UniProtKB/Swiss-Prot annotation:
Pfam families: Proteasome
Main subcellular localisation: cytoplasm
Role noted for this protein: Protease subunit of a proteasome-like degradation complex believed to be a general protein degrading machinery.
InterPro entries associated with the record: ATP-dep_Prtase_HsIV_su, Ntn_hydrolases_N, Proteasome_sua/b, Proteasome_suB-type
Annotated GO CC locations: HslUV protease complex; proteasome core complex
UniProt lineage: Bacteria, Pseudomonadati, Pseudomonadota, Gammaproteobacteria, Enterobacterales
Inducing or repressing factors: By heat shock.
E.C. designation(s): 3.4.25.2
GO MF annotation, one: threonine-type endopeptidase activity
Binding site for Na(+): G157, C160, T163
Protein name in the entry: ATP-dependent protease subunit HslV
Subunit structure comment from the entry: A double ring-shaped homohexamer of HslV is capped on each side by a ring-shaped HslU homohexamer. The assembly of the HslU/HslV complex is dependent on binding of ATP.
Active-site residues, record numbering mapped to chain: T2
Signal peptide start-end: none
Gene this protein is translated from: hslV
Length: 176
């Protein structure tokens, strides 16, 4: 699968992901970019799950952002509604982590839109390892959001066989 981690600290929000794509238990590609900028670079998003499914969801989410003038929560709720109720979309298997200057969210195909505590998100097969690492670093260091995300991905990559050490990182700055 993959690992996507999002950390928010001191006026910065980061979403970072590894680059491994697998087919069954075979690595097919090691440099997939699973994190990207959307809506005029005001939103960052990462995916865990099927690559083709995720690209479809990125496109749909960007349309929802445009429809709601960049309002992240409204766009996320509308995407989750469509994802849950549309027969074709329901078959898509992926999770999205999205963030802007005000919120960090997880969007699922079950219709869930979750804003996690401490604005810390970790999804995918390496998510539990990345979340534990990031939480420890948030609580015990003064590292930046970017440094925490990188270290959390490194730790997940050392433990999870579906996560590698090729990282794509996107960062937004805002007034804290």
């Amino acid at each position: 699968m993959t690992t996507i981690v999002s950390v928010r600290r001191n006026g910065h929000v980061v979403i970072a992901g590894d680059g491994q794509a697998t087919l069954g238990n075979t690595v097919m590609k090691g440099n997939v970019k699973k994190v990207r900028r959307l809506y005029n670079d005001k939103v960052i998003a990462g995916f865990a799950g099927g690559t083709a499914d995720a690209f479809t969801l990125f496109e749909l989410f960007e349309r929802k952002l445009e429809m709601h003038q960049g309002h992240l929560i409204k766009a996320a709720v509308e995407l989750a509604k469509d994802w849950r109720t549309d027969r074709m979309l329901r078959k898509l298997e992926a999770l999205l982590a999205v963030a802007d200057e005000t919120a960090s969210l997880i969007i699922t195909g079950n219709g869930d839109v979750v804003q996690p505590e401490n604005d810390l998100i970790a999804i995918g097969s390496g998510g539990p390892y990345a979340q534990a690492a990031a939480r420890a670093l948030l609580e015990n260091t003064e590292l930046s959001a970017r440094e925490i995300a990188e270290k959390a991905l490194d730790i997940a990559g050392d433990i999870c066989i579906y996560t590698n050490h090729f990282h794509t990182i996107e960062e937004l700055s805002y007034k804290a």
